[in-house]
């Protein structure tokens, strides 16, 4: 059913995951034209890696959120009660486990000033009990397991816990619960880290970024107000131990001599134009090799 909402972009995205580039230029050109014509042809996540156009990202997100996540008033306006002694910050994610997002925010959670802030983690994902999840459980003031709750229930729980600032770590990535924010789970709602594009949602007030991620000239393509962090918006995990094991070229399947180029991104981020450039480099550098991650 190629004419189903948002499916054409998903189809092209899957082709990139398989490194199937047959007719890809023609299909992407068709995708661009369909977006410009106002058709619902792609999800915001799929379009980020397919087309380098903040304006088309914005148009796609707007079409998507209007259809999938309409702003709701089911719980009514948030009634401001007595202020908490501490500001309550809620982080919302399905990835409080061994996952790149958790690895990025673990130090952030540790560095919050506990005399001024209370930290809540709302988990949409399964309980893994892995090392990272256990660390997060020990760091936050309250770990709220809500994977079995519906979106309205999660928003209601957030209000009952009087969350002041809700931080969505997912955007439109897999496993997201964006409708929680459409139900207005907190007075201030922020997008951070997991998704770098605009949501075009009335529900998200701010996005945290830096001027490399969102240059000032790109602000017009974002519905959110942009909070710029100095230098980098990414925190990183400074406590992560680096392996002290020394790997040999031979055990990894490489000859003793030669330069090894690496790209461990997922396949869908590699396009024919980039790959052609890589092949030119390999052609011009004697005894050079390209090491890719096998993801398909």
Residue ranges and their predicted role:
Residues 84-88, 255-262, 288-289:
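Charged active-site motifs of nucleotide-sugar-dependent glycosyltransferases
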Residues 253-255, 265-267, 280, 291:
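C-terminal amphipathic helix plus adjacent low-complexity
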């Amino acid at each position: 059913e190629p004419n189903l909402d948002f499916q054409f972009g998903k189809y092209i995205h899957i082709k990139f995951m398989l490194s199937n580039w047959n007719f890809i230029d023609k299909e992407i050109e068709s995708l661009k034209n369909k977006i410009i014509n106002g058709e619902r042809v792609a999800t915001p996540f799929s379009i980020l890696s397919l087309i380098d156009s903040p304006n088309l990202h914005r148009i796609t997100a707007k079409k998507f959120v209007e259809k999938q996540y309409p702003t709701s008033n089911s719980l009514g306006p948030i009634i401001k009660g007595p202020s908490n002694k501490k500001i309550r910050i809620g982080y919302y994610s399905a990835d409080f486990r061994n996952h790149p997002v958790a690895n990025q925010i673990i130090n952030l959670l540790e560095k919050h000033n506990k005399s001024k802030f209370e930290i809540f983690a709302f988990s949409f994902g399964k309980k893994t009990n892995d090392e990272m999840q256990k660390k997060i459980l020990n760091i936050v003031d309250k770990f709220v397991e809500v994977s079995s709750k519906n979106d309205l229930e999660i928003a209601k729980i957030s209000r009952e816990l009087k969350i002041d600032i809700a931080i969505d770590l997912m955007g439109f990535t897999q496993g997201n619960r964006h409708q929680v924010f459409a139900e207005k789970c907190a007075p201030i709602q922020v997008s951070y880290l997991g998704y770098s594009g605009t949501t075009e949602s009335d529900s998200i007030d701010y996005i945290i970024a830096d001027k490399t991620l969102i240059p000032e000239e790109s602000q017009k393509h974002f519905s959110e107000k942009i909070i710029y962090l100095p230098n980098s918006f990414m925190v990183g995990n400074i406590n992560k131990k680096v392996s002290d094991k020394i790997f040999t070229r031979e055990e990894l399947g490489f000859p003793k001599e030669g330069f090894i180029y690496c790209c461990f991104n997922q396949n869908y981020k590699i396009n024919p134009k980039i790959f052609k450039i890589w092949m030119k480099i390999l052609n011009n550098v004697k005894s050079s090799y390209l090491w890719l991650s096998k993801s398909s």
